[in-house]
């Protein structure tokens, strides 16, 4: 039988099966398209795909480019309805097809951001193998510290300190792992489904009625801690050259080492850090704007019992595993602080050390470490294709040219504000790249004095790091949190993140502007 006949028979059987089940091809296609996403969402995505080519040939590439950015932001905002990769990816493919960008530009953006991709592939996976130790550490903190205000302070300050020596994305991955561990412990306890082979953490119908209110309170508690920790990573990440990917870029252009970067940024970064931590405390004291959720006693007891049981069951091999994790943690901080290699390569080293010395040698067990990060890595590459559109169509050029025309402190504040606004809607690595390259050109042309050039670099650094906490779009760590397996469990949607980040955004941005104006 020929290949043609085989294909024809398969097609006939499929069509016959559809006919027997009274499902038309069109209806089956609609059902399969974006899966279980709501019909209104599917309709909107199809409308976007139809609209873009029409706009391309009627109003031109510039307007269509801005419309595409808005459409892509919509897919991010609806992350809990449909993971942004399929829908956002369709928009990105169409952008290439209709000529808003090209495959070479997309590849170039990916090439420029290879350190970020390596970080996602290997550093996040490396943290997976440290999860046991990190959950143990943070669980001890949670069970020993009963004050929510103190917990908010600790999560914020620990996120800041860790991200100053690691990077914000890695620290966010740590906090996600910890929160997921907390949630899993109580959700499994509260489940009426005690056959754990059929237990599903994503469903609440198996939760005993008496625990429903405690579970909702616990979700609010974790949402609060996640936001305190995530904002903390942005606060600390702005202070050092390893904290954020764009910091490395700025430091390399300015020829700053670790100490130079910290000292130059300190007049703005330290006041913002202090005010950010104080904001966390104030939000919990006042129970304002969605904060103030407390840890229910039933949850605390379950977690304490789990900790005590695990402590009692831990043998010598278990303790040695924790020691190995602690040693690898020190190696990780030391390697990143001195920037001995690219972050992702250091992450691969950590994977090798932890798997070798803790006996994780099965491919299946190692593979689980990459499940969390790789979908987001693919999404980030799609995001870079949108960045390629921004670059190719010069969407930000008018704003950049206007800012460069200003002088003195006005220019510093304008740099901070323009970087901040653009970082809210775009990737802050891209924004920093564009502004630093344009500023470098102006400096090399003799249009900027060296002292002012240093200040402009700080304004770009703080502008891309501070207001960008407003939405998940600007900070890769925030987007990683939004699209993580934890977010739907604790009901942390796009708009909920925007809402919870708003007090931080306002206070930190005002502090950043004032520090840039009077202290820089």
Residue ranges and their predicted role:
Residues 484-507:
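Interfacial loop-to-transmembrane junctions
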Residues 120, 124-132, 136, 148-151, ...:
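Transmembrane alpha-helical segments of multi-pass membrane transport proteins and ion-pumping complexes
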Residues 73-113, 159-202, 207-227, 245-267, ...:
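Membrane-interfacial helix-loop connectors
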Residues 139-148, 367, 403-406:
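Membrane interface segments of multi-pass transport proteins and intramembrane proteases
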Residues 1-125, 264-401, 499-520:
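Hydrophobic transmembrane alpha-helices of multi-pass small-molecule transporters
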Residues 28-29, 105, 132-146, 186-213, ...:
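Flexible loop linkers connecting adjacent transmembrane helices
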Residues 45, 116, 148-152, 224, ...:
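Residue-level signature of transmembrane alpha-helical entry/exit and packing/kink sites
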